[in-house]
Amino acid sequence: MSKPIVMERGVKYRDADKMALIPVKNVAIEREALLRKPEWMKIKLPADSTRIQGIKAAMRKNGLHSVCEEASCPNLAECFNHGTATFMILGAICTRRCPFCDVAHGRPVAPDANEPVKLAQTIADMALRYVVITSVDRDDLRDGGAQHFADCITAIREKSPQIKIETLVPDFRGRMDRALDILTATPPDVFNHNLENVPRIYRQVRPGADYNWSLKLLERFKEAHPEIPTKSGLMVGLGETNEEIIEVMRDLRRHGVTMLTLGQYLQPSRHHLPVQRYVSPDEFDEMKAEALAMGFTHAACGPFVRSSYHADLQAKGMEVK
């Protein structure tokens, strides 16, 4: 077990330092050999990285963050090369320390009051028609960051009136009433909150989160705005069974969720939870068929699918896998 550390405000803690603070068994110790990636998990990198570097430069110029970079998303090259990115607001330091996630943990600094304006200008400069806004968890804020989400939505729409906005929000633990009062007053076009995995291994995968709380968050937003699609996603390959995934899908439908994403979990480093299995493309196709039969209007299911992967196409109901 790594030696516990004293966190300094504004410092990013990753890998061994981050995992040392997790109140579960350190999965990086004494585990079996890593699974070999199957052929279908091989990523093709674009030959020209000009567009990728351009997006990174725009982010740096305005002091913005993308979850694509901060979470080491395997689709970064593809998405950046197509001129799309998922913006991460409220800084790049998360107050949670989930052992599947590569976003840094620590004591974050105060939110940047100018971030909504800078974000809106960057999006306008990039001439985006669909944008996904997500954030780190901010358990240090009284509203969990909900007002900052609302401020970003307002600023973006002022600069780009025709744009579609999807928000991928945290669970607002202990702050649901306050957060929903704010978010339902300034709603996005798609409201997304990920369950991430199945109840049986929730404490291991999402320490500090609660499965039923997340379902209730999705349900209550839908009750306030029945006309707005609600969306959720899971990572698979962490030890769950296909039957458990299907049961989570049923729970989501019972709570009014209409859009679903399922993708393969990939281990960011040796300090994170190991991959227990690789789910085949055929299995993903079967789960998509199950989802559509349950009444999901959209289901993006495939090895490289992530919540915001081609989110504009997902929202249009186009095939994403």
Curated annotation (Swiss-Prot):
Signal peptide positions (record): none
Enzyme kind, highest EC tier: transferase
Pathway it works in: Protein modification; protein lipoylation via endogenous pathway; protein N(6)-(lipoyl)lysine from octanoyl-[acyl-carrier-protein]: step 2/2
Domain Radical SAM core: from-to ranges: 80-297
Reactions that this protein is recorded to catalyse: [[Fe-S] cluster scaffold protein carrying a second [4Fe-4S](2+) cluster] + N(6)-octanoyl-L-lysyl-[protein] + 2 oxidized [2Fe-2S]-[ferredoxin] + 2 S-adenosyl-L-methionine + 4 H(+) = [[Fe-S] cluster scaffold protein] + N(6)-[(R)-dihydrolipoyl]-L-lysyl-[protein] + 4 Fe(3+) + 2 hydrogen sulfide + 2 5'-deoxyadenosine + 2 L-methionine + 2 reduced [2Fe-2S]-[ferredoxin]
EC number of this enzyme: 2.8.1.8
Cofactors: [4Fe-4S] cluster
Protein name (Swiss-Prot/TrEMBL): Lipoyl synthase
Species whose genome carries this gene: Shigella boydii serotype 18 (strain CDC 3083-94 / BS512)
Lineage, top ranks: Bacteria, Pseudomonadati, Pseudomonadota, Gammaproteobacteria, Enterobacterales
